[in-house]
Amino acid sequence: MRCVPVFVILLLLIASAPTVDAQLKTKDDMPLASFHANVKRTLQILRDKRFCCRTQEVCCEAIKNG
């Protein structure tokens, strides 16, 4: 029963410790904003493709080819 307060204090100290990034950045790391922009662009292309293919078959072929 005497260990419980010590355990609680240790948990509080661990939870309040500052977090540190364990991995150092390399020159190959890309910023998160760039990653989000790529995802956004890809989703936009897929949305356009889906809408276009529903309305016109010719448009769908044009998107597939380039």
Curated annotation (Swiss-Prot):
Family to which the UniProt record says this protein belongs: Belongs to the conotoxin T superfamily.
Modified residues (4-carboxyglutamate): 57, 61
Post-translational modification (record): Contains 2 disulfide bonds that can be either 'C1-C3, C2-C4' or 'C1-C4, C2-C3', since these disulfide connectivities have been observed for conotoxins with cysteine framework V (for examples, see AC P0DQQ7 and AC P81755).
Pfam family, one: Chi-conotoxin
Record GO cellular component, one term: extracellular region
Subcellular location: Secreted
Signal peptide per UniProt: 1-19
Modified residues (Asparagine amide): 65
Tagged with keyword Secreted: yes
Name of the featured protein: Conotoxin mr5.2
Propeptide boundaries: 20-48
Domain notes: The cysteine framework is V (CC-CC).
Record key words, sorted: Amidation, Cleavage on pair of basic residues, Disulfide bond, Gamma-carboxyglutamic acid, Secreted, Signal, Toxin
Molecular function (Gene Ontology), one example: toxin activity
Superkingdom, taxonomy of origin: Eukaryota
Protein's UniProt keywords contain Disulfide bond: yes
Tissues of expression: Expressed by the venom duct.
Major place of residence: secreted
